[in-house]
């Protein structure tokens, strides 16, 4: 059981890192626009998905550990 939880944590961390670096993100579309970006929100949008994934994986691991 502990091996499965470690594997789940490792996979979720790898996926989170790949989402943050843009490997699994939406990086295939060209980013050339004529509009100016007024805030840094689009640059931080991929970080939110990765941290949500890490939070859910951590919650699952804690629930399995407590049961």
From Swiss-Prot:
Q: Which InterPro entries match?
A: CAMPATH-1
Tell me the compartments it is located in: Cell membrane
Q: Which GO terms describe its biological process?
A: positive regulation of cytosolic calcium ion concentration; response to bacterium
Give the positions annotated as glycosylation sites: 26
Annotated signal peptide:
1-25
The entry's cellular-component GO terms read: plasma membrane; side of membrane; sperm midpiece
Q: Which residues form the propeptide?
A: 46-67
Q: How does it sit in the membrane?
A: Lipid-anchor; GPI-anchor
Lipidated positions for GPI-anchor amidated serine?
45
Q: In which tissues is it expressed?
A: Epididymis. Highest levels are found in the distal corpus and cauda. Little or no expression in the caput and proximal cauda regions.
Keywords carried by this UniProt record: Cell membrane, Glycoprotein, GPI-anchor, Lipoprotein, Membrane, Signal
Summarizing the function annotation, the protein's role is: May play a role in carrying and orienting carbohydrate, as well as having a more specific role.
Under what name is this protein listed? CAMPATH-1 antigen
- The organism of origin for this protein: Canis lupus familiaris
Q: What is the lineage of its organism?
A: Eukaryota, Metazoa, Chordata, Craniata, Vertebrata
């Amino acid at each position: 059981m502990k091996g499965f939880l470690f594997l789940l944590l490792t996979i979720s961390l790898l996926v989170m890192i790949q989402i943050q670096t843009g490997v699994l993100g939406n990086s295939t579309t060209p980013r050339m626009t004529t509009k100016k970006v007024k805030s840094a929100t689009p640059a931080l949008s991929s970080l939110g998905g990765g941290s949500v994934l890490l939070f859910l994986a951590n919650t699952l691991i804690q629930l399995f550990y407590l049961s």
